[in-house]
């Protein structure tokens, strides 16, 4: 087994030592010895030592009540420090003989393959410049780490980078060491659990901070890399106006199931984004004004600024004044309705035009090397982020729109919209959409719920169109769901064609997505209300919770194929929006592989996807890592567009139909049909306690009820904590075994080798099974589950073992992840720190369920720390 890189080991060891020193300083050497005994016992137990297992449990059992929290914190913080070291290792300085990372080479290598396949250089340059990739940042409540700590973690990363030079003087090394010691101590003495739930505005500010501290720097670097690669490969440059990557957000716009996101919140977040954008551009302009001290300028520039000794500075000064005015106005508008003063920047062209004039002038005067420095970076940012930083999506449940329209139709004595069939609804909606008179009389007084729906639509009408993305309708199922929103927007004064996007997210809705869109596109007048593309969102989380990951994945694939076919037939351009989570159970996984496994024709130069919770930090939290991931997105979308995977063969389709049918039956037999399942789930996992964790602004439950009432995130998060990982694999074990017993093993092998969709699914399944651990899950059962429910736990663990056996048989390996030994080694190293947290968590859950009143405070804090630690150790929470 190849060892983890020695430099990574050294960083992890050093940070661990510094944490140990900090703990010894506060609690003394005897306490640190206990932590070491726990760690060594866990490590030995993992190697099969009964003595080690005994040492682990004896030391944990012997802990005083007052020691539970610091022990949990110690293992939690070690895992966070290991994550920092691992993340830095991905971007550390390369030694002279080391190859460049795959992410940096992917685009150039792809352009070479595309040219070899017959694509003309000019066509490749146009295609790459015209890509439309939009990453939608969402605040799903899986970002366990606090913002305060994230900033300290980033400072530790910076020190690791400073240390990574062979030519440091001894005093420089000791200065770095002291700074690291201070930072680790700051981390240790900072409470890692938020005391209060973040508001939607807090979440939006967190998203803006990722842009400010990482993406603002990463984006121009990525486009500079694209420009250089294009020039080498095709002889052409990336146009200044090209924005192949853009960013949108749901933070402050996603009100589905979140009563805290109101129309007022949406307005506030839109203004905050404008304030942040103006502030970031002002920093850029200050730097440019210092740099561009040249005198020689083009006639066009001189005509704008008159007789000036420093024409570039004169023009930038005008832009700076307008940016200051814009920032000042947004600040005032946050306190109350204030009309925009003259000079406030309203259109992106007002920002871009003076910058472009400077760029053209410098090139015309033989100063291209200056033009293509910081000024070009600022132009790239202006094309990508614009004046509004991100485009804000709005999302609401279809039921809320239907309820609002019902109230309106009843008030107008037209009957109850909710009780009408689809045909009647469509007739009413089409008539109202085409009518010139308003639907609502001026004196109409709606209920609070309807007033909020209408206020949201009015907030959209009041916002600049360029600041908004799409209006997403969750739980959409019928054409009327889309027209209902179009009517409410029209009624509220939205006079531009906002994209209204149905989100198909249950198994039935995915199966019905094609017929629904077919009907919609043939409705009279619908096409004329379309703004360019038809966007459709595919939900990964809820469909997987509804049907299991295998059946859901096949339904998502078929729905996309059908939508591609229908839009092609109607000559409408399709944009698919992928609502993926961070975990496999919610459609997560490496983006590069996921994009290349989409159905042929479904990408076509456009790709929109959610980036969620903790995955935003792991993928985009540091500029260098953000660059790697953005490079991968560009290469994958270009490849999926110009070299799409083959269409599945009929035999593969038939096999997927059989697998999906068997998997659905097996999944629902457990999750829906077993009368003990919901009670077992609530007792064997920390599901109830997760609701008390102040993670995101959204409640964890939709309403009272069984599994279907749970949001997809706590559903996954709870099973991850106990290492059963049930949602990610349940159904696969039965479907694959049935196929093998029918003699279809060779066909499965062929699908795995030749069909990217199936390959990616099996790879993701293998990764999840490598992180799952039946022994840990059993410990939770023994501590928390009454005797009468334990047979169900045993059965689920048997199914997990069956899944492992079947996957090993299919991949021809004796060990999971045998082909990815570094990943296996990383999981194995983490287990020594995770195992004590799991044991502690099971014990704390048992105690907290017995205790009442004030005595629970300390237990609860320790319990929440174990939740955060396990999430950090497994690197994908929900």
Curated annotation (Swiss-Prot):
Keyword match Magnesium: yes
Catalytic activity: oxaloacetate + phosphate = phosphoenolpyruvate + hydrogencarbonate
InterPro entries xref list: PEP_COase, PEP_COase_bac/pln-type, PEP_COase_Lys_AS, PEPCASE_His_AS, Pyrv/PenolPyrv_kinase-like_dom
GO cellular component, one term: cytosol
UniProt cross-references to HAMAP family, sorted A to Z: PEPcase_type1
Function: Forms oxaloacetate, a four-carbon dicarboxylic acid source for the tricarboxylic acid cycle.
Name the record gives this protein: Phosphoenolpyruvate carboxylase
Species annotation: Pseudomonas paraeruginosa (strain DSM 24068 / PA7)
């Amino acid at each position: 087994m190849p060892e983890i890189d020695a430099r990574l080991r050294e960083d992890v060891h050093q940070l661990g030592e510094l944490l140990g020193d900090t703990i010894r300083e506060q609690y003394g050497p005897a306490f640190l010895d206990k932590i070491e005994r726990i760690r060594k016992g866990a490590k030995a137990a993992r190697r099969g030592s009964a003595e080690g297992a005994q040492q682990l449990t004896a030391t944990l059992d012997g802990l005083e009540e007052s020691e539970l929290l610091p022990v949990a914190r110690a293992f939690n913080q070690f895992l966070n420090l290991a994550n920092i070291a691992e993340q830095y290792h991905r971007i550390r300085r390369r030694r002279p003989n080391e190859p460049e990372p795959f992410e940096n080479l992917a685009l150039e290598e792809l352009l070479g393959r595309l040219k070899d396949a017959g694509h003309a250089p000019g066509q490749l340059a146009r295609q790459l410049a015209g890509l439309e990739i939009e990453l939608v940042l969402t605040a799903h409540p899986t970002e366990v780490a606090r913002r305060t700590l994230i900033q300290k973690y980033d400072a530790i990363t910076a020190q690791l980078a400073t240390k990574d030079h062979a030519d440091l003087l001894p005093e420089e090394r000791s200065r770095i060491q002291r700074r690291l010691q201070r930072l680790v101590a700051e981390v240790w003495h900072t409470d890692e659990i938020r005391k209060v739930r973040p508001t939607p505005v807090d979440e939006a500010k967190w998203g803006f901070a990722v842009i400010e501290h990482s993406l603002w720097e990463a984006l121009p670097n990525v486009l500079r890399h694209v420009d250089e690669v294009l020039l080498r490969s095709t002889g052409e440059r990336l146009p200044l106006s090209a924005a192949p990557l853009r960013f949108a957000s749901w933070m402050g716009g996603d009100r589905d199931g979140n009563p805290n996101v109101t129309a007022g919140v949406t307005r506030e977040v839109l203004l905050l984004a404008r304030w942040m954008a103006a502030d970031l551009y002002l920093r850029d302009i200050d730097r440019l004004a210092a740099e561009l001290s040249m005198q020689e300028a083009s006639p066009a520039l001189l005509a704008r600024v008159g007789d000036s000794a420093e024409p570039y500075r004169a023009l930038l000064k005008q832009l700076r004044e307008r940016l200051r005015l814009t920032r000042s106005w947004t600040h005032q508008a946050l306190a109350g309705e204030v009309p925009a003063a003259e000079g406030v920047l309203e259109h992106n062209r007002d920002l871009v035009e003076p910058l472009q004039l400077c760029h053209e002038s410098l090139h015309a005067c033989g100063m291209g090397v200056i033009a293509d420095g910081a000024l070009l970076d600022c132009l790239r940012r202006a094309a990508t982020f614009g004046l509004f930083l991100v485009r804000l999506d709005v999302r609401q449940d279809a039921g809320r729109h239907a309820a609002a329209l019902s109230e309106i139709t009843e008030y107008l004595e037209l009957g109850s919209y909710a009780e009408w069939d689809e045909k009647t609804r469509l007739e009413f909606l089409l008539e109202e959409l085409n009518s010139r008179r308003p639907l609502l009389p001026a004196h109409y007084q709606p209920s609070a719920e309807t007033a909020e729906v209408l206020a949201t639509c009015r907030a959209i009408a009041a916002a600049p169109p360029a600041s908004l993305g799409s209006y997403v309708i969750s739980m959409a199922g019928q054409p009327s769901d889309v027209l209902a929103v179009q009517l409410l927007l029209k009624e509220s004064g939205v006079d531009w064609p906002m994209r209204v996007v149905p989100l198909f997210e249950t198994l039935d809705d995915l199966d019905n997505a094609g017929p629904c869109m077919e009907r919609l596109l043939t409705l009279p007048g619908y096409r004329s209300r379309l703004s360019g593309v038809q966007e459709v969102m595919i939900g990964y989380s809820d469909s997987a919770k509804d049907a299991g990951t295998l059946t859901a994945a096949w339904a998502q694939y078929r729905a996309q194929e059908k939508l591609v076919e229908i839009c092609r037939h109607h000559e409408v351009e399709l944009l698919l929006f992928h609502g993926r989570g961070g975990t496999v159970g919610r459609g997560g996984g490496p983006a590069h592989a996921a994009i290349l496994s989409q159905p042929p024709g479904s990408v076509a130069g456009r790709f929109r996807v959610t980036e969620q919770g903790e995955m935003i930090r792991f993928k985009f939290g540091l500029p260098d890592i953000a660059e790697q991931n953005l490079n991968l997105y560009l290469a994958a979308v270009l490849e999926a567009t110009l070299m799409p995977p083959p269409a599945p063969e009929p035999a593969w389709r038939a096999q997927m139909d059989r697998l999906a049918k068997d998997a659905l039956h097996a999944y629902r037999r457990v999750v829906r049909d077993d009368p003990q399942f919901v009670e077992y789930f609530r007792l064997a996992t920390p599901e109830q306690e997760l609701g008390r964790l102040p993670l995101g602004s959204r409640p964890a439950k939709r309403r009272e009820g069984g599994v279907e009432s749970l949001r997809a995130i706590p559903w996954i998060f709870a099973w991850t904590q106990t290492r059963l990982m049930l949602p990610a694999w349940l159904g696969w074990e039965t479907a694959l075994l049935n196929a093998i017993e029918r003699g279809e093993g060779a066909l499965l092998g062929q699908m795995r080798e030749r069909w990217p969709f199936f390959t990616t699914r099996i790879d993701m399944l293998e990764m999840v099974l490598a992180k799952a651990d039946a022994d840990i899950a059993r410990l939770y059962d023994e501590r928390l589950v009454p005797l009468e429910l334990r047979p169900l736990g045993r059965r689920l663990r048997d199914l997990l073992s069956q899944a492992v056996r079947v996957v090993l048989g299919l991949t021809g390996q004796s060990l999971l992840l045998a082909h990815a030994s570094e990943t296996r080694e990383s999981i194995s190293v983490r287990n020594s720190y995770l195992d004590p947290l799991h044991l502690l968590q099971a014990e704390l859950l048992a105690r907290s369920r017995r205790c009442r009143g004030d005595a629970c405070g300390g237990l609860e804090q320790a319990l929440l720390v174990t939740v955060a630690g396990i999430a950090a150790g497994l690197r994908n929470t929900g």
